[in-house]
């Protein structure tokens, strides 16, 4: 691509990248440095029911404080019963919070992309941006969703990462490439309408305007990212408690020993 087109493309992507990197830096800090937690199985939370499954195959469920493993009810003593009840309550409380956090992160990403690219690509690109973000939301929906009072969280941590991965990056690249004509017209118009008499003065004015837009977007995203980070920190602490509780549960109930739900970076609970 010629130098001018490259510069234009970089200008467009940098605004969105700056915002998204601000989001990622905040939201990933605790996840990757302190709280790397993944799920080995799918989790479904319904009123008075917790189901742990693998691609639709139920491994165990806790229903009305009763434990069923592979469809068979397990007899529990009082100590085991207390652990099962506590574990069910903790998982049932945390899964909806994780899903809410994911949805807020997606909404924040959508806002960042729209704020960054619409001024450059023009209003005509708005529909394409909406379509791209709808595709992202659809991919997220397949691994983390709420339908009424039913909550579902997919098994692998990578599923959420994939939603923001290569396919999303490719869609954004295609959006920019397909809108280069409109983008150059918008940029040219904004450059020529800038303050100053000479071309250099207009370029300086345009550069300052772009910097101002970028800083404004980054500020908006950073404020939202701070909130998500704070919520993530609280969830992290609760997940640490859940890891210990689940290990106790699996130690006390042999039927659950081979179904570790939680996996951490430092300790893999699969045996």
Features from the language model and the residues they span:
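General N-terminal targeting signals
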Residues: 18, 22, 67, 77-79, ...
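Extended amphipathic alpha-helical interaction segments
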Residues: 129-226
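Gram-negative bacterial Sec-dependent N-terminal signal peptides
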Residues: 1-24
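N-terminal Sec/ER secretory leader and immediately downstream segment
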Residues: 23-135
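A cross-kingdom marker for long, charged
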Residues: 204-271
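Short, flexible coil/linker elements and helix-boundary hinge sites characteristic
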Residues: 9, 18-19, 121-122, 193-194, ...
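Short, surface-exposed, charge-dense and proline/glycine-enriched linear segments
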Residues: 108-111, 125-148, 183-187, 250-267
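Solvent-exposed, flexible loop/coil residues
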Residues: 5, 78, 155
